[in-house]
Amino acid sequence: MADDGGDEKKQVAKFELERETELRFEVEASQTVQMELLTGMAEVFGTELTRNKKFTFDAGAKVAVFTWHGCTVQLSGRTEVAYVSKDTPMLLYLNTHTALEQMRRQAEREDERGPRVMVVGPTDVGKSTVCRLLLNYAVRLGRRPTFVELDVGQGSVSIPGTMGALYIERPADVEEGFSLQAPLVYHFGSTTPGTNIKLYNKITSRLADVFNQRCEVNRRASVSGCVINTCGWVKGSGYQALVHAASAFEVDVVVVLDQERLYNELKRDLPHFVRTVLLPKSGGVVERSKDFRRECRDDRIREYFYGFRGCFYPHAFDVKFSDVKIYKVGAPTIPDSCLPLGMSQEDNQLKLVPVTPGRDMVHHLLSVSMADSPDDNISETSVAGFIVVTGVDLERQVFTVLSPAPRPLPKNFLLIMDIRFMDLK
């Protein structure tokens, strides 16, 4: 079916969904698709859809519209693929949510803390989606769960290369996701935990400490618990990092997606009181290529500076070399024989190494630390925000930055990331 839209006719398709089925679609490159719920009730990753409201999805978006009771959905625009599936694990995901809600009710009755859930699995099994679903279902029942993001490759609480936590007070927006007001964010500096596993585990512990402090003073946060998203690196040091996170957050439930081996290893290595559940991944989960991941990371950073669909105007200004101190967390590895007596390579991983401003800083992201002095344990201090270096003038001893806020910078300790952002779009 199509309606008249000038020269290029806009493709319009209607889908009748039976109960407990989902419409899956992907938006074609450089296209947008509008979706509208015409009749019935439906949800996208746990967020209810408003009837007769048009939702817009940009190129590359992968969306699943699920209905418990049946509905009619209309899509306008070019999709790479669009089909209705009866084969969905949503009932299992709902059962998981129901079990967590029972734990919250018990916590309320017995004046204890609510469930802390960690979602694990290899890459491309839908971990972030399951987290979003569990958080949305909880908040729709009046809970206030905390979302903890340990996946530095995607950084959905802030930008890639960071770890953080977000107090969820309303369901995720269908188009934009969760409202990112006032997240707690820590600088990691790279998109893979393996570049500095000691720092990664240290920040995990720090996030757990801060979450515990919040639970002590906020009963609602304590009863609601948390949902922890993790990296898809599940072998070797990556596996050890999962075990470390489970212990740091004292998790009660581990949801393993699509990997029996990981499920059995965690069952063996985690304390017996931790409930470990194996759930299937959704058939709608798509494998993402390296290029697609890189594009997603760039989009995430672009959105940080320019807002969702370019609704912000970032500021550009010069910063004097003498006004700031730039550091990198972690010194390069050197042979053990060259290390001072009694020092190990691991100590090196948390070391703050001063960075001399130079042209090689161009396009690199810098985290603005909340620390007031170098003695503040900068690597474990949260960050105020991020800037990207767009130019360096050695003669004038200044570098130009793109910043979401106007000058001056709120603090003068900066941490450099391995991540670069070319502002080309």
From Swiss-Prot:
GO terms for cellular component: cytosol; mRNA cleavage factor complex; nucleoplasm; nucleus; tRNA-intron endonuclease complex. GO terms for biological process: cerebellar cortex development; global gene silencing by mRNA cleavage; mRNA 3'-end processing; RISC complex assembly; tRNA splicing, via endonucleolytic cleavage and ligation. Its EC number is 2.7.1.78. GO terms for molecular function: ATP binding; ATP-dependent polydeoxyribonucleotide 5'-hydroxyl-kinase activity; ATP-dependent polyribonucleotide 5'-hydroxyl-kinase activity; polynucleotide 5'-hydroxyl-kinase activity. It holds the Pfam family Clp1. It catalyses: a 5'-end dephospho-2'-deoxyribonucleoside-DNA + ATP = a 5'-end 5'-phospho-2'-deoxyribonucleoside-DNA + ADP + H(+); a 5'-end dephospho-ribonucleoside-RNA + ATP = a 5'-end 5'-phospho-ribonucleoside-RNA + ADP + H(+). SUPFAM superfamilies: P-loop containing nucleoside triphosphate hydrolases. Gene3D superfamilies: Clp1, DNA binding domain, P-loop containing nucleotide triphosphate hydrolases, Pre-mRNA cleavage complex subunit Clp1, C-terminal domain. Signal peptide: none annotated. The keyword ATP-binding applies. It is found in: Nucleus. Keywords: ATP-binding, Kinase, mRNA processing, Nucleotide-binding, Nucleus, Transferase, tRNA processing. Its main location: nucleus. It is an enzyme of class 2 (transferase). ATP binds at residues 22, 62, 124-129. HAMAP family: Clp1 (MF_03035). Polynucleotide kinase that can phosphorylate the 5'-hydroxyl groups of double-stranded RNA (dsRNA), single-stranded RNA (ssRNA), double stranded DNA (dsDNA) and double-stranded DNA:RNA hybrids. dsRNA is phosphorylated more efficiently than dsDNA, and the RNA component of a DNA:RNA hybrid is phosphorylated more efficiently than the DNA component. Plays a role in both tRNA splicing and mRNA 3'-end formation. Belongs to the Clp1 family. Clp1 subfamily. Component of the tRNA splicing endonuclease complex. Component of pre-mRNA cleavage complex II (CF-II). This is Polyribonucleotide 5'-hydroxyl-kinase Clp1. It comes from Gallus gallus (Chicken). The lineage of its organism: Eukaryota, Metazoa, Chordata, Craniata, Vertebrata.
